[in-house]
Amino acid sequence: MVDALDTNDVVDPNGNIWMDRNLGAAQVASSSTDAYGNLYQWDRAADGHESRTSGSTSATFATDAPGHTDFITGSSDWRTTQNDNLWQGVNGVNNPCPTGYRVPTEAEITGLVITNTATAFSSLLKLPLAGYRNSNNSLLANLGVFGYKILLLQEH
């Protein structure tokens, strides 16, 4: 994981403070393919599964911490019973963000999304479309074409 000390903050027009890159990216993007970052299973902690090269398993879990670093396949959720409240705020049980940051709400990112590539790369906040890992077989898919908007917002 990239330490928040190695990043810069970007302030949006609403005053929200964002980390300057995709979570897990080693650098700020200078193209649409050089700073994808990690691929997280929704609401799962940063336990190693987010690495693009982590192993995989089909065993789902009933707990909030699987206790291994494998990407969980075979279901649309890594938990036996879905729990979509584990990333809530900087103190969220499974918050994958560096200290002081959190995953923003949908409302916070709605006005931030830029769909024009030229405009996106002239802005201060550059977030390439990282793709995703297929939940059936863990293979990488749609790099540069698709990206879930898992951005980091600083709590203030």
Regions found by a protein language model. Give the residues of each.
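Conserved positions within compact, well-structured domain cores
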Residues: 1-156
